């Protein structure tokens, strides 16, 4: 039986070469999972803190995780993996990225950027939602290739990232924090302004990013919510923070219409790709659905309330 380091080595070699060795293929033999099943397996993982075998194989399988990039809106491209998102927002003055995926797939993320015509020297901002490896784990590979980019997170997000990077299941991380934003602060490139919202709950350092997307003659308000899972809960106060964050994200004040999720399986986004690609600019868009977004947030808040009662009485 190979250990975790050997497994990751096999995966990395396979991802770099674009093929699987026989040993890696045997270890990673998995099947395609629909979003609903992935979500159910992650719920199971959050409750038991034990990775379901089928989910673990699916997450590590290049044949499942490596997907081509696609255009989501006139100014937004999906450049991430099947299970974890990364977005490229093109502006008149460079590119804004949201999240960086993780190793051993970060080279695929970078290849996706190049595929959609992005010169890495044109990246202005790399906005990271929180410190978990799947969101910041590609930053170390990207940084030397994107010399003009600034890397952004909240203070607690940076703290979590460096704590996790030094842990037993550690990962390569930047040498030090770059740009630290507080709740409500913004970055901009061209006419695009992105606001950081501190939305603790998934972790204490989780942030979400609020920005406009272009859809033909329409401008729609979008958000990338940093995290929705309850797999890292430390106490009832964190669940209270989670519930408050869900309510804030659903508020009329923010007026979010588009959920550009950090994890596609949470909204069935992978299954929407054909409709997204067929979308006529300015027409109905599969992701432009404020009522559905608010219903999801309300359901998540109810789930967190139930989890609080179950765990803490």
Model regions and ranges:
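Accessory terminal helices/loops
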Residues: 2, 14, 26-62, 216, ...
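N-terminal export signals
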Residues: 6-26
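Active-site neighborhood of phospho(di)ester-bond hydrolases with catalytic His/Asp-centered motifs
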Residues: 98-99, 124-131, 152-154, 199-200, ...
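Metallo-beta-lactamase
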Residues: 57, 65-66, 71-72, 144-145, ...
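Extracytoplasmic/periplasmic, Sec-exported soluble proteins
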Residues: 81, 101-105, 131-134, 201, ...
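Conserved beta-strand hairpin/beta-sheet module of binuclear metal-dependent hydrolase folds
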Residues: 62-116, 208-229
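Active-site environment of divalent metal-dependent phosphoester hydrolases
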Residues: 105, 131-137, 158-161, 204-207, ...
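Active-site HxH/HxHxD metal-binding segment of metal-dependent hydrolases
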Residues: 28-33, 76, 95, 104-107, ...
């Amino acid at each position: 039986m190979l250990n975790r380091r050997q497994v990751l080595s096999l995966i990395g070699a396979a991802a770099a070469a674009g093929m699987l060795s026989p040993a890696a293929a045997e270890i990673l033999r998995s099947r395609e999972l629909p979003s609903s099943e992935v979500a159910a397996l992650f719920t199971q993982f959050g409750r038991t803190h034990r990775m379901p075998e089928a989910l673990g194989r699916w997450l590590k399988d290049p044949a499942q995780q490596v997907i081509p990039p696609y255009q989501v809106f006139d100014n937004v491209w999906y450049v991430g993996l099947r299970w974890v998102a990364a977005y490229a927002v093109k502006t008149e003055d460079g590119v804004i990225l949201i999240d960086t995926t993780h190793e051993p797939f970060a080279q695929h993320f970078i290849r996706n950027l190049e595929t959609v015509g992005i010169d890495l020297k044109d990246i202005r901002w790399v906005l990271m939602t929180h410190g978990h490896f799947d969101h910041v784990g590609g930053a170390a590979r990207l940084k030397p290739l994107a010399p003009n980019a600034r890397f952004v997170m909240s203070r607690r997000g940076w703290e979590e990232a460096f704590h996790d990077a030094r842990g037993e299941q550690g990962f390569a991380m930047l040498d030090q924090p770059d740009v630290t934003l507080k709740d409500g602060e913004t970055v901009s490139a061209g006419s695009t302004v992105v606001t950081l919202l501190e939305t603790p709950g998934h972790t204490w350092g989780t942030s979400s990013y609020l920005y406009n997307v272009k859809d033909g003659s329409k401008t729609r308000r979008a958000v990338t919510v940093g995290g929705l899972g309850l797999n890292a809960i430390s106490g009832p106060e964190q669940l209270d923070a989670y519930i408050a964050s869900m309510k804030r994200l659903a508020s009329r004040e923010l007026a979010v219409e588009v959920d550009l999720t950090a994890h596609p399986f949470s909204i069935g986004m992978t299954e929407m790709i054909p409709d997204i690609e067929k979308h006529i600019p300015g027409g109905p868009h599969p992701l432009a659905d404020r009522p559905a977004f608010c219903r999801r947030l309300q359901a998540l808040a109810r789930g967190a309330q139930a989890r609080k009662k179950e765990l803490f009485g």
